[in-house]
């Protein structure tokens, strides 16, 4: 009877040892499987060649897992917001200008984005202030003005859908200075996804398969024949502006 008890006890101990060992292995495997390493790249995406080199400095960072964009924030196109002393000043009498003019002191922005956007995570809403950098070097903002709708400030937007505030020149609408009902590159957003004009390079017309963020996967003029996820300015007029919101969100690349 005593030997039987010892055998039974030994079997129970062995069972729990095996159970604990298997449970530990499973948890270790799960942890390993859910770890996603950052993708390392050695060359900048071809689209970055479109950016205004007088305003931007773009380089790989964090060992090639991210891209850093430093910009003066000063665009290479005309606007009333340059001020009359600038060669790029454009008289726009119909624009209810904000008090500021462009200055290198307050437009400078530095952003760091993933070199390869993570499209497997959750969507993230855009916030106020800079949500991306345009090819001109200026900032891109979303469809909000302060905590209200853009309608309240629409009269202050220049011919290319931009104005200054708070102290930063930025686009809210389709920036007609470099994209106007076409497939041109607009810029890069904070999630590392490129933003293009209203038309798609692969079809030369308005895409019909966009998600809620204005994104889809197709070949672009910068992807060397490979399909990649990117955003478009959605071809829907905004309010009474007669133009189109640059990007509302949410981000898909976080």
Model-derived features: where do they sit?
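Sec-dependent bacterial lipoprotein signal peptides
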Residues: 1-20
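Bacterial Sec-dependent N-terminal signal peptides
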Residues: 17-44
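A motif-centric signal for short, conserved binding hotspots located
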Residues: 40-169, 173-254
């Amino acid at each position: 009877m005593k030997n039987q008890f010892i055998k039974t006890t030994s079997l129970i101990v062995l069972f729990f040892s095996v159970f604990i060992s298997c449970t530990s292995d499973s948890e270790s495997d799960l942890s390993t499987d859910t770890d996603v390493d950052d993708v390392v790249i050695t060359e900048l995406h071809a689209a970055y060649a479109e950016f205004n080199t007088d305003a931007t400095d773009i380089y790989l960072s964090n060992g090639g897992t991210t891209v850093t964009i430093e910009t003066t924030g000063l665009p290479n196109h005309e606007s009333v917001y340059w001020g009359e002393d600038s060669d790029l000043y454009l008289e726009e009498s119909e624009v209810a200008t904000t008090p500021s003019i462009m200055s290198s002191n307050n437009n400078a922005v530095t952003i760091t984005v993933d070199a390869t956007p993570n499209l497997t995570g959750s969507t993230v809403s855009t916030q106020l202030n800079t949500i991306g950098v345009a090819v001109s070097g200026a900032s891109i903002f979303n469809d909000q003005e302060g905590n209200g709708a853009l309608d309240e400030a629409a009269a202050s937007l220049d011919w290319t859908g931009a104005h200054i505030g708070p102290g930063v020149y930025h686009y809210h609408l389709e920036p007609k200075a470099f994209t106007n009902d076409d497939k041109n590159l607009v810029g890069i957003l904070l999630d590392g996804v490129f933003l293009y004009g209203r038309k798609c390079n692969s079809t030369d017309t308005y895409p019909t398969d966009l998600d809620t963020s204005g994104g889809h996967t197709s070949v672009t003029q910068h992807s060397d024949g490979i399909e990649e996820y990117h955003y478009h300015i959605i071809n829907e007029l905004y309010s009474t502006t007669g133009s189109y919101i640059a990007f509302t969100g949410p981000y898909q690349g976080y």
